[in-house]
Amino acid sequence: MRWSKYLLLLVVLCLLAVGCRRDIRIGGIKGEEKVGPDYSLRDDPKARARMQYREYLRLAGDRVGKNDLVEAMKFARSAEKLDSRSPDAFTMQAVIEGTGGNAAAAGTLYRKAAELAPQRADVLSNYGAWLCGNGHPAESLVWFDRALADPQSNARAASLANAGGCALDAGQNERAEQNLREALELAPDNAYALESMARNEVLHGRYFEARAFYQRRLAAAPATVSVLQLAIQIEERLGDRTAAGRFQQRLREEFPSGATLNPQG
């Protein structure tokens, strides 16, 4: 599932969070605050349905975490039955299909979610991420542009990082650097933006700058096959065989199957 590296963690985490908290708060009211007479959500069928919808999504996310994809899909489809116009049920189904290796099915569901929520930056960026990771980086930029149309979006930094990385894949290097630098201004520890900036510096032959970005990337998040391979490539270009050897050893020890992969793959 190569394209999963582009997905907004924000989206998945927010999606799961809708049902993770049992103390559901309405209208921002919490604790002992009151604005009217007490009543029970059990008296409101719409409120009950909304709570059940959130619970189905929570259960689906829980099952994904346990790799029980069959049960996860049952819960996600139950959520869809309660609210077929909400993008979150389709996003959850897309996550499940992607986790199971069904990239085409996941793409269809991400697009469905995007069509249902044309103003939601997180949902639009997820479909862009799927397009980018499945060989359509130029097309993905259209969806990232839609996601970035809202300057106040909570997903802006992640959308910029995704757009920058995918612009790099599309050969749009000037746009890539602009988007990535904007992303890092908003979120200096964004792992994907840092790794993409390291790739960008390599493309321009700026290996010392590339080293600085991969080092920041390794400090920001756990190592992956791709960033270790990138570090090896950069250190070899800088002539530091000792450093390259250390990363090769890490790659063999932490990701045995990744030791033979193409560094650009």
Describe each region flagged by the PLM.
Residues C20-R77, K81:
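N-terminal leader/linker segments that initiate helical-solenoid repeat arrays
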Residues I24-D44, R217-G265:
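Terminal, low-structured helical/coil segments at or just beyond the last alpha-helical repeat
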Residues R48, L82, L116-A117, D150-Q152, ...:
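Structural marker of alpha-solenoid helical repeat scaffolds
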Residues R58, M92-V95, N126, L160-N162, ...:
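Canonical tetratricopeptide repeat
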Residues S78-A79, K112-A113, R146-D150, E182-A183, ...:
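Canonical positions in the second alpha-helix
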Residues A89, V123, R156-S159, A193, ...:
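TPR alpha-solenoid repeat register
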